[in-house]
Amino acid sequence: MPRSSATARKSHSNRHENGLVGPGKKVNKQKSNGNLNGNTNGASAPNSGPSTQVDWPASRSSSDSALTSSATTASKVNGSADTSKADGNGRGLLNGYAKGNADMSYGQTNGAVPQNGGLAGQASRRTEKPATGSKKSGSINPLQLASTILKSCPMYDTIAILIFLLQLPPMVLTLVQFLFASLTFMPPSGASSGSLTSNFDIFQGPAGTPSLGTMIAMDGFCLLFWGLFMWTWAQNFALDLAHVQVAITLGGGGSGKNGGVNALCVGIVLVLHLIRSKGIQDFVIGHLLSAKIVSPDFLSQYSHLMPPEFRRTEPQSSPSWMRSLLAVHILAQAGTAMARRSMAKNRSPAPPRNGKRVDTEASAGSQTQIDSAFESGASVSSYIGADGQLVTPATHKDGRDRLMSAKKRRRQANQVRSRQPFWAALASTKVTVMREYEHSRALNKTGRGLMMTEEDLQGISLDDGLVWITEVDSSTIKFAAGDFSSVDDPALAGVCETARLGNDETEPFYVCVNGALWATATITKVQDAPKGSNTVHWRGEVSGLAPNCAYTCSFVRSDTDEEICVMSVKTPAATDAEQVSSIPTPPQPSYRPSSPTTTLKNSIVNAEVKLNEKRARLRKAKNDHKLVISKIRKELDNYNHRLQSGTDENRQKQRSLQLERNIKQTEEITAALESQLDNLENIPEEELEEWSTQKSKYEQELEQLNLAKEELVSARAAVAREVSSLESELNSAIQRKERLQGRRTRVNEQYERIVSANAQGLNERERRAAEQFAREQDQAKLEANFHEQFASISQSVQEYQVRTNQLWQQAAAIEQAIQQQQQQMLLDSAPLTPEGNLPGTNPLTEAPGMSLGALTTTAPNTRSLLGLSFPSLKSSPLQHASSPVGAASSHPTSPTQPPSYLQHFPTSPLGNTGNYFDMDFTYRDRSFSNRSAHSSLYGADFLDSNRRGPFQLDLSDTVIEKRMDSGSEGVTPNPIMRPISTPFQRADSRGSGSGSGSSGASGSGSGSPSSTGGKGN
């Protein structure tokens, strides 16, 4: 059936005379005359196989117009026209037969390779005969055309194939995917290993397909992505996407602008997976039930209408590894195809304005669409010459030079073949199968290289006068014919019967080669031919032909001069090396039959060449025969001489006597040997005894040898054990030696490092020791200074206490004086009332010589307290000029003279100074380079002194503890002064020592780093 109504309207564009053409390809029409290539109907022979279409006209005579007008041309194809077979066997095979009437003209060709891969299907005749069989039918039946031509419908084909694939069982579907994946590894025709010239060739490959490295890389990347990032649902979805890719490829959905087809197929698969997903079903049903849109009763009532594969009760399982690998490969190649399409779209020029739909991937590797037109029309305008080269007209030659190279044309052809729609491929398969089935019976022996015989023509009637070719040689053509006595025309039958009655050997037909009567054609009748429909009655041979030339053989009846059939035959090339070298080969022999004159000239030349060759061979044979005759004569003379010299009787007698003597000597030697054998059979007793003694000696020697061997083995074992022990000891000694050597090297290295360090750091140590000694001396001096200051501070405290008592006494005296002054003022003042003083309010009398000014005196650098002046206090004890203990007192005198001993105590130096042990006092930490714990200047208790609060210490206790810790023996603390503790507790040094303490005096000691005790000063 037609796929659409447009088939009838556009049937002229769907007639592919040159075979199946890919989608979007334009087929060039043949504009030249078909008779130029030997085809009267204007149709070119296909160039896609070994088969060749052969047409002969049905008309035999120009006078019989009725027969020629009603005749039809029947053609059949005979494959297996193998060029290599024809060249290797040195002969071609052409079998055919033709009817004797005008109903049918049939021919079969099998032999030398003519134009376009087979024997040319030429329907040429002699120039005076009209070619009436070349008429074409002006009208085309749409139904008949639709039954042979299938229109490409990518969308329908792709969707139909996808639906078909989704319904297949898993096992069959896996097999389909495996077959489809194996197609990507099949090398296309014309594939060759070429170098990569650009980035596009990486995706394209040398023959229009992706290269093997690209396929492996894409498969590996997709397999890694499949295993790492895809869950079970995604894997099953990708598995069905592989079905989509198979359907798109087989249905031609990837050709042209069919993005809608791809999106539709992917959408169908996605919707199916979403509907089948258990999670989505639970979500939708739960949402409907929660929103009260659908009731549970309604769902339970109509749930049986849902297909069982949509009602999932358990989650999906992961696909098998085989299906996963196939899906990964198919999807990887789909991604590669998408990349190739995009890159080809960028490389291809702007599309034409006529709106033709072109497959970008099918056009990969070509610049324009002219390549496809040239490739499809190449078989129309070109033909193969005698030497196997392609011969084209001048116009097509110029156009071919402007097209792409042969590599890109081959790549484009492979792309078109790979992008062929599925239904077109089925149609091509059907045509090929039917054609092979029709001719399988006739080609079963030809395919094995055997000649076809008359027994192979089963089912063909030969009783109506047929002629067929049996063998084609380089210079001869052999043929056979049936019986011409039984024909349909009664008049012709009467003529043949009359001729047979007159002479049985009369030839019923003759042969014309290229329109000329061929005199060297011989026709003989088969003797004793049995009666039958398929019996050979006539055999003939056309000789005198030139090799590698085209001939038109016409078989004409002898009585009516009517053509029985016309056959175009091309003789194969000569296989004889001498003949090939002697015959000049024309530069470009044409396949068209020559004229009669040219044919005769070529035959004459060929005959002369053969005659010359035969003469040369004859001369050579004569020379060879002469040499052989001379050799034979020499041998004959030798034999004659030997015969003549061998006739003497004396020589014969001497020879016979010599032979008799030889016979007697041989008999005597034989008898002696027999006697020796008899003696050897009877062994003497002496020899037996000697043999037994020798045997016993041999056994003893053998035992000694065995004992020696055992001793040797044991000795070897002992020596081996000793050697192994010695080797083990040697190995252990070597190991110890290696360890000692390693240790020695390490010690040497350490020694060298120490020596170098000592050499470099000797001065540094001396300098550090000197600095340490200097620091210790400074610390000792500072400690002595501190002791002196502590003593002065304690004395100042005592003086301050005495001064405080004195001040209290002065304050009491001042208060008493103030009271007296107030009483005096009351006495000296006026009375409080006009009447006078009240009783009891009389003031006291003024004390003579007492005035407040006498009580208060102000001296410079003193502070006044209620009119009293006090001397200024001393500054910090860290000042360079410390106050002496016996300094004169500067306090003012009071009315009451203080004791004399108080005048020797100055004011306290702590009056206007801060605490010496507050947070403002900083110290320097011990250096990290000084790692000696015994040479530290400060104890562990003093390290965090700046991190503590102010010392609340009693200075007297500090002084006592310091003196006790200094190591002075026999010195008791001052009972007047309280002991003062100090945080400066010097640690015992291994190389230094100090001491202090005496009653009323101070002492200090210091020592060098090499001293063992302190010295007192």
Swiss-Prot record:
Known role: Component of the regulatory network controlling carbon source utilization through ubiquitination and deubiquitination involving creA, creB, creC, creD and acrB. Involved in resistance to acriflavine, and required for normal growth on a range of sole carbon sources, including fructose, cellobiose, raffinose, and starch, and reduced utilization of amino acids, including GABA and beta-alanine, as sole carbon and nitrogen sources.
Does the keyword field hold Disulfide bond? no
Q: Where is this region: Disordered?
A: 1-92, 106-138, 339-368, 575-599, 830-857, 877-907, 964-1017
Regions of compositional bias (Low complexity) in chain numbering = 58-75, 1007-1017
Superkingdom of this entry's organism? Answer: Eukaryota
From which source organism is this entry?
Aspergillus niger (strain ATCC MYA-4892 / CBS 513.88 / FGSC A1513)
Q: What is this protein called?
A: Probable ubiquitination network signaling protein acrB
Chief site of localization: membrane
Family affiliation: Belongs to the acrB family.
Q: Give the CC-aspect GO terms.
A: membrane
Where is it located?
Membrane
Q: What is the lineage of its organism?
A: Eukaryota, Fungi, Dikarya, Ascomycota, Pezizomycotina
Q: Where is the composition biased (Gly residues)?
A: 992-1006
- Membrane topology (UniProt): Multi-pass membrane protein
- Compositional bias (Polar residues): 30-54
Keyword presence, Transmembrane helix? yes
* Coiled-coil segments on the chain, per record: 604-783
Q: Give UniProt keywords alphabetically.
A: Coiled coil, Membrane, Transmembrane, Transmembrane helix, Ubl conjugation pathway
The transmembrane residues are: 159-179, 212-232, 255-275
